[in-house]
Amino acid sequence: MTNSTIRIAVVGAGGRMGRQLIQAITQTKGVVLGAAVERAGSTLVGSDAGELAGTGLLNIAVSDDLSKVTDHFDVLIDFTRPEGTLEHLAICRAHHKAMVIGTTGFDDAGKAAISAASAEIGIVFAANFSVGVNVVLKLLEKAAKVMGDYTDIEIIEAHHRYKVDAPSGTALAMGEAIAESLGRSLKDCAVYTREGHTGERKPGTIGFATVRAGDIVGEHTAMFADIGERVEITHKATSRMTFANGAVKSAIWLSNHDNGLFDMRDVLSLNEL
């Protein structure tokens, strides 16, 4: 990217996260909203993106086709759903546009497609764009190295009633951070939502529990429990703006990377700690 001002496009512009992303872009120096996209047939198509997000008139009409606005942005921010994100990925790859991906729930094939595209374009792909959550992931790596071999590890997450995937991408990222520190594969040691006569807890496993209720933005706790004591590392989000601001920060950071697959820990230089 050669422009001093980074042009950002937002897909899913009319959703809760999309509106917050537009707000974050308008409040951040060095970036502008270049395009806003909604699904074909949406009643929001043609409306002004700024008025939609409550930031005032921006003179950017919401489009129903990302491929028609590729000349208007440098980086795409996508917090939609896996099938839509993969369609957007193909368009960005064809037009050499960077991507910030906050969509969760990808299967292995979807993750492989993202990895393959990163050979040609810059991608920041993260389960959570909160600075706090990514600090927590680093703390979990450290805690697991000290306590992980002898404690019972459980991850509990809670989100609003509208979230469609479980466990959350952040909960899985927490589990992966712990498992990797212990030299394990999360696929081999994860236990999801126990029910019925489960028998005693198996050593070396990582348990997951999920809550879906009300308007909870996002709460995650990792527990390292031993006999006589336990350590809990918790993050609670109270506003989606923390994710939106992190995504915009990632878009700015990507301006210095023509290709490659990164996560929020790269953006925050946490991998250097």
UniProtKB/Swiss-Prot annotation:
Gene Ontology CC: one annotated term: cytosol
One GO MF term, please? 4-hydroxy-tetrahydrodipicolinate reductase
Q: PROSITE patterns, from UniProt? A: DAPB (PS01298)
Q: Does the keyword Cytoplasm apply?
A: yes
Q: What does this protein do?
A: Catalyzes the conversion of 4-hydroxy-tetrahydrodipicolinate (HTPA) to tetrahydrodipicolinate.
Assembly and oligomerization: Homotetramer.
Q: What is this protein called?
A: 4-hydroxy-tetrahydrodipicolinate reductase
